[in-house]
Amino acid sequence: MQQNIERNQVSMTTSRFVWGAVMALVALGSASAAELNLPDGAALYRARCGTCHDNPQDRTPARDVIARNSPAFIMAAMNGVMAPMAAGLSEAEKQAIALHLGARPAGGSQEINPHAIWGPPSASMPLDGPKCKGKIPPIDLSTPDQWNGWGAGITNARFQPNPGLTAADVPRLKVKWAFNYPGSKNGQATVVGDRLFVTSMSGAVYALNAKTGCVYWRHDAAAATRSSVHVVQLPAGAPAQYAIFFSDWTKAAVALDAQTGKQLWKTTIDDQPGVQMTGSPTYHEGKLFVPISSGNEAFATNDQWECCKFRGALVALDALSGKVLWKTYTTQKEPAPFRLNKLGKQMWGPAGGSIWSAPTIDPKRGLVYVATSNSYTEVHHEGSDAVMAMEIETGKVRWINQVTKDDNYIIGCPRAANCPEKVGPDFALGNSPILHTLQDGRQYIVVGQKSGAVYAMDPDNDGELIWMRRVSPGSELGGVEFGMAADAENVYVGISDVITRKGGKPGVYALRIRDGADVWAFPAPRTPCRWNNIFCHPAVSQAVTAMPGVVFAGSMDGHFRAFSTSDGKVLWEFNTAAAPYKTVAGKQADGGVMDGAGPTIAGGMVYVHSGYAGRSTQNAGDLRGREGNVLIAFSVDGK
C-alpha cells in the first residue's frame, strides 16, 4: 500500500509539471518558436511526427486534424497520451513542435480555454447539470430492473430480462432528457433504482437521477476513465453501505461511496509501459476483477520506443480494502530482448495480449474468463487472440483457446521501425465472452473477433471449439468490436467493418447459439451525416443490447435502431445526430458517432451515448470538438 501511495504522489507531481508546461504555452499565446528561441519545430515534426501523421492509417489523426488544436492542447498530448511517441524530446523541443503545428487564436492567448484541453481538470468546471433538490434517497439494489456493470450480470450477456417496457412500447420511445459533459469518450451507464452512474474521460464520475438527469454528485478523479461502474453492497462495519467500483485509464482501480462520491480507496494495479485500461471491472463475492490493456500498438510507431514490454493481465482485488489478491498475465513469459529494430533500438517479447473487455464469471466451475487481443512482436505469445480461463481464487490459468496464432501487429507498418517481421491482421478479441446456458442445461462460451468470426467454446472441455461462424471479412477496425448480446436462443452480433480490404458487411446479425446457424441479417444502409469523414459509416462497432423481443444497436452514422429478435425487422429508429439537444443544464449539445459503450435498459428507459473521440467533427480525431458527446435518455412517449 505504501508503494501505491508513493506512486500516486509521483503521479501528482508529474501531473503538476505537465500542467505547468501546458499553462506556459497558454500564456505564450500567439508567440512563435523563433521569438522564444526554441528549436526548429518544422524540422522536429518532420523527423519525429511526419512519418505517421502525414500518412495517417487506422486510428492515427492526420496533421490537419492535429493543427486545429491549440499549442497547449498538443503539448498536453505529448506529455500525456502521446508521451511514448514523444520520448527523448526535451520540453523545449515539444514546445517547438506544438507551436509549429497548433492553431493560434486571432485574439491572442486569452481565447485559449485551458479547461477545454482533454484531460482531468473537471474539478475546475461548473457542474454539468442542475443539482438534485431535496434529500438524497438511499441506494436500492433490490430492484429487479437494474443494469449493473458492463454486461448486466456476471455472464456478460448484455440482456435485460426486466426492462420495464415491452417490445410493443419501443416504437413510442422519445427523448426524455440529455446530458452533455466533457471528455472524448465516456463509460456506459449503470442504473440501480433511481441512480445512474457514469464515468468520463474528463476525469469526472457522476451520480445522476435516472429519471430526470439532475446531478446527485460529481467526483473529480485524478485520471480519465471510460470503464463502467459496478455497484455493490458492502458488509456491516464497512466505511460505506454501498460502493461503486471502476478503473481509471492510467493504472488504478477505485472505490467510491455510492451515496456521496467520497473516495474509499484507490490502488495502483499496473505500471507497465504504455498501460491504458479500458475494460470494465466485474465484481463477484467480495472480489473485483480488473482487466489490463495498453496503447503499445500506437506507442510503437515511435521508432525510438523500446517495443514492447507490456503484457495484458487480469488483477483480482479485495473489494473492501482494495488489496491486490492476485495478478495473472496473459503470457507467463516475461518480455526479454530478442533483436534490434531498424534503427538499432532494443526490441522485447513476448508482448501484447491486452484484455480490452470485462471479465466473465463462471461460479459453477470456479473460473473467470477473459478475451485477449493481438501480440506486438514476433516472439510467440500463447495468450494473444484467445479466450483464457483462470481460477477465481488463485488466478492460475486453467486453459487457453488461441483462435489466431502469431497475430503480431502495431500501427503504421510497414513504415515503423518496430514492425514485426511478419505483420498480422490485428484480429483481436475485444469483447467480453458470454457464458450462455442452453435449454438442455449445457453451457457455451460465445465470443466475437475483429476477423468477423463468432465462436462457441465448451467450458467443460478446456474451451474446445464447438462451432465457428464467419459473419464478415473483418479488419483492424472490423468484425465484432465492443460487444454482442444474447437471449435464450440467439446471439446478436454487431459488425463494424468500417475499414476492410474485401467487401465489408456492417450491420446486425442474429445467430442461433445452439449451432451457429443464421437466423436473420440486417445489412446497415449508408446514410448521410453532419460530418464528412470515414466515420460517416453504417458500422455497428458499439456494443449491442437485448431485452425480451428487442435488440438495440447504434451505428457510427449516429443511427440508433431497435430490431425484432425474431426476424430482424426494424421496430424503431432514431437519428441521434440529426438535431441538437437541449440538455438538463439548459445548453445545446449535439449527438454524433455511436461507438464504444452500448445502450443500457432499466426502469422503463433506454440510455445511450452519442459521440465518440471527436469523430463527429469534420476532421475525425479533433478531441476538442464540441460536437457529439451526449448521454441520451429515452422513455415511452418521453414521459
Curated annotation (Swiss-Prot):
Domain of life: Bacteria
Keywords: Cytoplasm, Heme, Iron, Metal-binding, Oxidoreductase, Signal
EC category: oxidoreductase
Catalytic activity annotation: a polyvinyl alcohol + 2n Fe(III)-[cytochrome c] = an oxidized polyvinyl alcohol + 2n Fe(II)-[cytochrome c] + 2n H(+)
Molecular-function GO terms, alphabetical: electron transfer activity; heme binding; metal ion binding; polyvinyl alcohol dehydrogenase (cytochrome) activity
Keyword Heme: yes
GO cellular component assignments: cytoplasm
EC number(s) from the headed UniProt entry: 1.1.2.6
Binding site for heme: 49, 52-53
Residues covered by the Cytochrome c domain: 36-152
Pfam assignment, any one: PQQ
Function (record text): Catalyzes the oxidation of polyvinyl alcohol (PVA) in the polyvinyl alcohol degradation pathway.
Family note: Belongs to the bacterial PQQ dehydrogenase family.
Official protein name in the record: Polyvinylalcohol dehydrogenase
Lineage, uppermost ranks: Bacteria, Pseudomonadati, Pseudomonadota, Gammaproteobacteria, Pseudomonadales
Encoding gene per record: pvaA
